[in-house]
């Protein structure tokens, strides 16, 4: 046998579920409570600092807020929305509760100042009431934290733009002496409420075979016996009367579908059509009648169905006014016509406005003139129906009467303030729009025409059904202890009303109900992209106007502007219910449970005309999580199968599909299926995920140099308490932990040797969980009992190892703490300096079996020699900053051995400093076959432990076989 040695230069590649012989050198079986670093090696994870107790209720939606305030710097908060809809917010750094007030009144950004000093107007927010944690989704943009309830369907407000009265306007356009100015008035029939009475008439009638399918075999009856023309006159059926039509039954002799030998092989194939000659009155769509035995042939039956109806109105003359001008004074002409109307036309009132006449009535009417060159008339037209309140708590339907002109040139220069006109332009509805006259200073006469929304329709969004906001107000107050306390306002948002067009020319976004419906599609999530708010609902993506976040309607019905709202839909052959998204360089990545899409534009400006959506992936997505930014790439979890997977989407561009890599392949069956809570940090190249109410956090550490990934490691942390929310903000990891029906806030600083988290003056961190400090003046020494007592600054967990660490002249002194109630006791005198108290946690690394490895051929892949015989003599472990740690050797057929490595001995470090070795090589004797033992390295001590590398020595033979 040959004596050989081999070195694994680093152990930062994390856990692998592969067989040991396939593991890449540097991977391990288990890596618990570690933190890989490409520079510093495999570190013991940082301890967690106890911040404060938060609440006794863990249920609800938890979230965090991070914003940069130019006056106070980085502001960090954690919040909870209870199941009942109450909002609680704490400062992440201090744990102090912040002031939260409520408003039931929808607000806009311009109105925030009115609420700075407001008190509570409510104790709960109904929109926030929820049953499932993922029912509420949160998005923070500057001072606004938007909250979306996935179970609430958006709706329109019952408030409508007030319909105009029955009115008309006559503008004098020419003065012609000795020519009559004639106006004819007609009243349109209406009911007692003033609604236009409309009579329906059939405009579409269909016919079908009834009780047979148009095919008759010659065995059953004579060929084409049912053909003919059949007339129906003055027929009453359904809800109408007096319809006339005739039907034409045609026949063709064909070869039978079921020939028999008994008779001649012939059959009759019939077709039928209907021609409407009189639509009658009173019919409704769907009315039908069956006519039987046409032509005296039994079974020759047909069903006639009304498919469409039209409506007519009845007019009655109210009279005529006429003025034969013998003057060239327009004022005289107008005054004379106004006087004639008021004196002779019953129920109609007229007034002179500038160069025209404003006419109104309590009942619908029309006005016309035989000579349009003298006067231009803007008269009322029927513009459909609208729904309004009836004054008794209900609703009623009204006729929407709106004046109309064919083109903008017919609009008068002077008019009634507030007068609304529909400009038709052509026979197409798509180019119609509405304008409103705005008189100077709100007065009749001179003014301008401005585009407006169609009156009588729902143009206002119901704020109570839309996402609400938790708003960080500008004012900050101080509590009795001098701590800054922020003010937050919980309120619905005031969404801008539709200011132009109607349901066709300026439609609602997809998440709002279609016209005639009550409820829309629930908003699944909100995003922020290209200075727009983004709403995901079913397969639809809707965006606000650019920079005007609470405006979801277009600016004009005349043209599409670049900053108008965007409404688009993804296209897929499988259900694509969108759940979340992430901004990437190429656009906006949106994800559904089974597919990924890219919303983008090929133009510099994202607009309704330039938006494009492409399908770029078909991978399963865990909808309880969110897509994550990995620098230029995107990562996301999948929960298909028994275990979770983590995919990375690489090179997302507009001209080709991205490459998707499963980064969790090495972890195999390690990741739990129900991962739900995800925290990530691009600065620290770290992703942390866990199940809700679990104390185990799965971590993925990555690092790239150029296009090469040099670090891709999975490892796990175990914490005291179950995680209900966690987040990484800059270099700090925050976790809300539930233990014993108490939610507590802790923080771990991820950056090694960061001054803010360095507890000893030697730049070594103390690795306690839930650590807290006690000042020397708060320590009491009892000389008789030789005990030091103090009030515990942290929670007490009976099952955990509680210790103290001295920071004074005896730096590094460690003692066990006994607790009685809230009083902690240490043996000896500890009053010379401050102390840190906390709970030990165990760092554990389980090494894989050792095999001789070599690079294979030109491919350079690592290949393990599992056929040869290897007896390992010893293992030399190289460590960095390390104090107390243990090596546990489990051997087949032998007792387990635990080798303890103490801190450096006296004489090897400076007095009154922490006895921690900066670098050391420790030998672990093995003397066993490589497949017969397992080695673990652990540290359950407040001192650091850093693993650099491992080198094994042993005797090896290839058993005289050569690999080929």
Which functions belong to the PLM regions below?
Residues 1-95, 189-191, 394-525, 529-577, ...:
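N-terminal beta-propeller domains
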Residues 113-180, 188-190, 355-359, 363-369:
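Hydrophobic or amphipathic alpha-helical targeting/insertion segments
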Residues 1-61, 66-73, 644-964:
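Beta-sheet repeat architectures centered on beta-propellers
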Residues 49-58, 493-531, 536-685, 690-728, ...:
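Beta-propeller and closely related beta-pinwheel folds
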Residues 62, 329-345:
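Amphipathic, non-transmembrane alpha-helical segments in extracytoplasmic/periplasmic proteins
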Residues 86, 290-303, 307-315, 343-419, ...:
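Acidic, small/polar residue-enriched beta-strand/turn segments
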Residues 57-60, 111-136, 495-524, 569-580, ...:
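Short linear interaction motifs
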Residues 198-323, 339:
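Conserved, function-critical positions that sit in or immediately flank catalytic
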